[in-house]
Amino acid sequence: MSKFSFNEQTCIGCGACVRICPKGLIHMDTDGPKMDEAASKRCNNCGQCVAFCPVKASMQEFSKGIELEDALIYDPRRAPTILKFIKSRRSERLYSPDPVPHDNLMRVLETANYAPSGGNNRTIRWIVFENPEKTAELREMIAEWFDTVCRTHPVYSKRYAIDSILERYRGGRDVILRGAPHVAYVVGPENAVWGPVDTGIALGFFNLACEALDIGCCFAGYATKAGEWEKVAQFIGLKPGEKVWCAICFGKKAAHAVRIPYRGKVPLTLL
């Protein structure tokens, strides 16, 4: 069965789907665009044919029965607001203890799911600590990782000020997860060529989606590295052959930025 079809009643035969397919899998036949079965085996459901059809005639088997949203049409009047929104994003280290509502969490994850990936292979998987009590367990487990594994680790024993971290943590200052009620891990196959890149892009989408709902984020390096420890890996539900690519902590903001700090000149070479 072909992964591509079209509405014969609305198709205008413009060939947009043919031109836009990244792999050239669609061709124009006498009665409209076609994707044969051999080509379908190479189709990775990227959705370009559906996205760019001007009359919404192109269809994917993959999204059959799903009501598709209209894309936001470019409007130059929105550009200043969108650019300022992106620049206004800050790493959040002060959180409300109240958990993020489930519906908002799912809106964020559904948006992050649209992040591009190498070859549209989409190999990453999300593990999200929605329950703050589970987050507290993870936090304590990371402290244990510092006090055991890190002390004898050839790199981490030198990289981290372990005694200082643990002293502040045990004194009531959460320098491990910054008091965040939630943590999200991005994991995937350990042999995924574009795993680190796909993860960075996905977390960028996640972070900006959070900002749209007044949720703050901070990349969680300690949680990421602790994911190498078998005890943490088992606790978060890592599957055989998977590895932790990165973690991010998040929650409702307890503080809001009022200005955008200067970042200096762009390090740049134009060729």
Q: What does each model-found stretch correspond to?
A:
Residues 167-171, 243-271:
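C-terminal helix-cap and adjacent tail motif
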Residues 12, 108-112, 182-184, 189-235, ...:
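Small-aliphatic-rich amphipathic alpha-helix that forms the alpha element of a beta-alpha
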